[in-house]
Regions:
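OB-fold/S1-family single-stranded nucleic acid-binding modules
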Residues: 198-228
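Charged, alpha-helical interface segments at or near domain boundaries
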Residues: 57-58, 62-134
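N-terminal DNA-binding module of tyrosine recombinases/phage integrases
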Residues: 1-9
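OB-fold (S1/OB) nucleic-acid-binding surfaces
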Residues: 155-176
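Non-catalytic DNA-binding core/recognition domains of DNA-processing enzymes
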Residues: 12-84
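Structural detector for short beta-strands of small beta-barrel domains
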Residues: 121-124, 131-161
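Short nucleic-acid-contacting surface segments enriched for D/E, G, S/T with interspersed K/R
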Residues: 145-149, 179-196
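Extended accessory and catalytic-adjacent subdomains in large enzymes
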Residues: 163, 172, 179-186, 202-214
Length: 228
């Protein structure tokens, strides 16, 4: 019987220390929930991509403190280890991948500010109560809005620097939504988001909540009904 992917992560973890140990430990926790029974010979790029491009942007609040580089360095070390010891081919991540993860983290932070997300940190949980009050007041105005949409969307166009054109997955509906210029400057065509939208009495659309934001390179996983 082949070794399990998670047992190989634990095997590799014994060789790590310091920051790399912390990063690989996070990768083990992630993998034990999603790839618990997967054998090492079934490992592929998506195991790494889901961790780097779907899990990390939800957890890392400061993309400029070097943490993302540490995660990518640790994952590259692990990828090299399984290439050399188990003949499993997983691509090495590059500076482009680092910049893309940072971009997504930056977009998440901009949306938190734009939508009055009161959560400053998830671990430990820290909430800004002034922002919480603003968010609560905003949501009490829902009675004045005529229509809502929620689900996965792909970003199709950036319009005039303050609107984006979204296409709802599975239905194909196009919606033009107002955004902050700081957000418009960071997003790219092809990005994927899971969001709640509402239409105001003047028939323009706006964001209510952003639940998830992903780079286009995980679109195939979203289409396969992978949720994180």
């Amino acid at each position: 019987m082949e070794k399990l992917f998670c047992s190989v992560i634990k095997e590799f973890e014994k060789k790590m220390s310091g920051d790399e140990l912390h990063c690989i430990d996070d990768f083990f926790d992630f993998s034990s929930k999603r790839f618990r029974f997967m054998e090492i010979n079934s490992a592929n790029n998506q195991c790494i991509d889901k961790f780097l491009f779907m899990w990390i942007p939800k957890k890392v609040t400061n993309s400029e403190d070097g943490q993302i580089e540490k995660y990518v360095k640790s994952i590259n070390s692990f990828s090299k280890y399984i290439r050399e010891n188990y003949d499993v081919i997983i691509d090495e991540k590059t500076n482009y991948d680092i910049s893309e993860i940072k971009r997504i983290c930056g977009i998440n932070n901009e949306f938190k500010r734009f939508l009055y997300n009161p959560v400053i940190s998830y671990s430990p949980m820290i909430i800004d109560f002034d922002i919480y009050k603003k968010k609560r007041n905003m949501l009490t105005k829902d009675m004045f809005f005529t229509m809502t949409e929620e689900g996965y969307f792909t970003l199709e166009e950036i319009f005039r620097g303050d609107f984006v054109i979204l296409k709802k997955m599975y239905t194909g509906r196009f919606i033009k939504v107002a955004v902050d210029k700081n957000i418009a400057n960071k997003v790219k065509k092809g990005d994927v988001l899971f969001a709640s939208l509402r239409q105001n009495p003047f028939f323009s659309w706006e964001f209510v909540e952003l639940y998830k934001y992903y780079s286009s390179n995980v679109l195939e996983y979203i289409k396969a009904n992978v949720t994180f």
